[in-house]
Each structure stands twice: as C-alpha cells, then as structure tokens.
Amino acid sequence: MKRWKDRRTGLLLPLVLLLFGACSSLAWVCGRRMSSRSQQLNNASAIVEGKPASAIVGGKPANILEFPWHVGIMNHGSHLCGGSILNEWWVLSASHCFDQLNNSKLEIIHGTEDLSTKGIKYQKVDKLFLHPKFDDWLLDNDIALLLLKSPLNLSVNRIPICTSEISDIQAWRNCWVTGWGITNTSEKGVQPTILQAVKVDLYRWDWCGYILSLLTKNMLCAGTQDPGKDACQGDSGGALVCNKKRNTAIWYQVGIVSWGMGCGKKNLPGVYTKVSHYVRWISKQTAKAGRPYMYEQNSACPLVLSCRAILFLYFVMFLLT
C-alpha cells in the first residue's frame, strides 16, 4: 500500500507542475493596465482606475500606459493603421487596411505613444490573415490577424487586450478609442505623432441601422452627442475598448475601427467591426497557424480560477482514492 501511494505521489507531482505552469503562464492578465499610483511614480499621466486622463478628432493626447495594447502598423516605414495586441504573437486589425498589400514590408511599433521616438521598437510581421468573407465594398467582416515573426516581450507598456463573446452592448461601459489618425479634418494628410484617445458611447444597432443603411449585424456603432469627437482616417484597425459594468479593472476590445460617414459629424456615429462575432474565428485561425489564442467565453469564472479549480479537484480526487 505504501509503495502504491508513493507511486501515486510520483505521478501527481509532474501533473501538478504542468497545471501550475499553465496557470502561471496566465499571470500576465489581459486588459489590466498599470495602476494609477505606479503610473504617477513613473512620471506618466495619472489616471483614475477605469478613467483615462486623456479625453483622433476631438480627442486628447494619451499615454501608452493607459492603452498598452495599442500598436501602430507600418508599411515601408509609414504609419498605415492601428492594431491591438492579443498576445505575444498576434495583433488584431481591420482587413480594409491591407487591400492589395502583402506582409513583406509590414511591421508594428509598440510600447510608445510617440511615433517620433528615437530608437523606436519595430516588430516584423510574418503572416497576414484577412477574413475569408471580407467584403471590400460593404466592409463586412472587416477583421484581420497579423502573426509576428518573433514574440513580443510583454511588459507594462505592452499588454494584451481581452476579448469576449458577449454581444450585448448593455454589458459595457466607459468606452474609448485610440489612434494616430488625423485630428483635424481640414488638414487632410496631417497625422499626429502622439497617440490620441477619445471617449465614446455605444449605440443601439437598430438606431444606427436607421441612420446608416449599409450597417450589417457584424458591425456596431459608437460616438458622442457632441460633434467633433470620433475616430478618423488613420485610426482604422485600432481598438474600441470598454469595461464590463461589473468589472472596471479589466479592459475588453469590443470593436475595431472600420468606417464612417465623415469624422465627428453630428448624429453620424463611427462604425466598428463587432469583435464578439469573431472570437471563435480568431481562435480557430490562430490554432491553425500553430500559435493558439484563447478568448474569454461567456462564463462567470475567470480562466485563472479554472486552473486553480482543476488543481483543487485533482487533490480532492487524490485524497479520496
């Protein structure tokens, strides 16, 4: 009997270490940015939890520590579109950014809010995946994945954004859009070097569909009651991020900047790809490429707790047998 128990212990140890390693790999939780106290110590713009200090057209300069998932996608050294970090291997963006482009000259910049920073870090793109049903006229299924040639070194200014299959816009609050797109529509072609951010509200699909007849169910819209605040040219592919109403500490990507009728016009909200409709496609595509990505399913239990629960159940089974 003692020998059998020793044998079970020998079998248990590697399994426990394997599960512990799996849980430890999730320690860098998506959507959790630097706390306001730590940010002040680093002489960055102070934030209140869930409320960026920055207020794109009508926006204000943002610090990368407020939106550490935001990246710039470059083509031949020029800013092309925005994107967001899903994990150390993957960047999420919009398909329309890459019309008739290949990945040979694509790079991303990350970890900075200033495009003019000396010694800026570039990361080469290895593969580009456009949605197979992308419609370049309607801009339906306007979503793309970029696989990097080497993994990102995640840190306080390079943090993955969370995604979720929750589609109900009522579940979200405190939504923001970021980008290096134009800030003044009268100065076309002039883009800022400093990242901009603007707060927006999510609007009901039926109301948006009445105003914008080309809206599909794969899109959502967001804007403000004040004209002059919106995403614009150059912001495409960037993330529309929100907090859950019951959890203001974690940020989720709800939309991808896609299209609009002008920028910041009254009663004409911006249109975004609805990310919740594509989390399973993202999961399947990344798995096929050999670099799987896990999204948060519509569950009350976080993934890290699930790991702990597995460990606990395994120990209980061990003690009872």
UniProtKB/Swiss-Prot annotation:
Coiled coil: none annotated. GO terms for biological process: proteolysis. Residues 56-287 form the Peptidase S1 domain. GO terms for cellular component: membrane. It holds the Pfam family Trypsin. Its EC number is 3.4.21.-. The keyword Phosphoprotein does not apply. Disulfide bonds join 81-97, 175-242, 208-221, 232-263. PROSITE patterns: TRYPSIN_DOM, TRYPSIN_HIS, TRYPSIN_SER. This is Serine protease 52. It comes from Mus musculus. The gene is Prss52.
